[in-house]
């Protein structure tokens, strides 16, 4: 049985989600809703500066385009309640506009003629289950209609924080993500639509301090760490490829080797383990949601006998998150009731 998916918002994550779904059996994109002309959407799907050219075929048709020979309907409705997802057989919507990222707003897709379930591709708030696949996906029971996949940084941070807490106990911590610039920043100095003075500055010419909700969101993924972490971002002049640095105080005394061994033992399809001296361009396009870098682990002994432990994990803030998103989508569809 094929699960048909709709995508609302065909931006960076929406387009990469369609690419990733081409590699998944039993899931296909049947309908895209975006206010942009289908010919432009098809062009941006086919050609991508950071992720490379689409390996399949894309052909513009009336009212949509063919992707690898299969028709994808394209509509341009502003309001979710006006999108007739059911006409395309869509069961699950990927809400990727960024504008309908709360439970109340996302539920507008569930109207008569709409979809059955929604997966938000952004943090969704306290009343929505936030899923980082292979960290806490088993919190889902199949009855949920709206869930969130969190953010790219949350998916980078969560498995690393989880491994630290399970093995050594986390008393508290602070994280910094050195994050590539995104479409929410200005390419040249100019007014920012959200009123952010720093994001109003030229993205490729500056280090831009910015907020990050990942440290707060970690409490939605790992409730035992709720309120124990703070964090922020430093946006830098790379188009994709980011790294999360986490500094923690642990309950146990540790060594660098003990930390690295715990991370190696926790590795899976979502959480990789690296011992090479890599840089950000080396992880573009990778499928790990988070890649722990054992070469960057540090343990600092303090005068009072305590320790500061620094760990780091790479992530492609575009494709790493998308890979995790689609893993969550597959699971969400599989357990649906």
UniProtKB/Swiss-Prot annotation:
Taxonomic lineage from the root: Bacteria, Bacillati, Bacillota, Bacilli, Lactobacillales
Keywords: Cytoplasm, Glycolysis, NAD, Nucleotide-binding, Oxidoreductase
Enzyme active site: 152 (nucleophile)
Assembly and binders: Homotetramer.
CDD domains: GAPDH_I_C (cd18126), GAPDH_I_N (cd05214)
EC numbers for this chain: 1.2.1.12
GO molecular function annotations of the record: glyceraldehyde-3-phosphate dehydrogenase (NAD+) (phosphorylating) activity; mannan binding; NAD binding; NADP binding
Catalytic activity: D-glyceraldehyde 3-phosphate + phosphate + NAD(+) = (2R)-3-phospho-glyceroyl phosphate + NADH + H(+)
Biological pathway: Carbohydrate degradation; glycolysis; pyruvate from D-glyceraldehyde 3-phosphate: step 1/5
Cited NCBIfam families: GAPDH-I (TIGR01534)
Site (Activates thiol group during catalysis): 179
Coiled-coil stretches noted in the UniProt entry, renumbered to this chain: none
GO cellular component, one term: cytoplasm
Gene assigned in the entry: gap
Family assignment from sequence similarity: Belongs to the glyceraldehyde-3-phosphate dehydrogenase family.
Residues binding NAD(+), per UniProt: 12-13, 34, 78, 121, 317
Name of protein: Glyceraldehyde-3-phosphate dehydrogenase
Tagged with keyword Mitochondrion: no
Entry's localization field: Cytoplasm
Residues where D-glyceraldehyde 3-phosphate binds: 151-153, 182, 199, 212-213, 235
Disulfide partners: none
Function: Catalyzes the oxidative phosphorylation of glyceraldehyde 3-phosphate (G3P) to 1,3-bisphosphoglycerate (BPG) using the cofactor NAD. The first reaction step involves the formation of a hemiacetal intermediate between G3P and a cysteine residue, and this hemiacetal intermediate is then oxidized to a thioester, with concomitant reduction of NAD to NADH. The reduced NADH is then exchanged with the second NAD, and the thioester is attacked by a nucleophilic inorganic phosphate to produce BPG.
Biological process per Gene Ontology, one example term: glycolytic process
Listed Gene3D superfamilies: Dihydrodipicolinate Reductase, domain 2 (3.30.360.10), NAD(P)-binding Rossmann-like Domain (3.40.50.720)
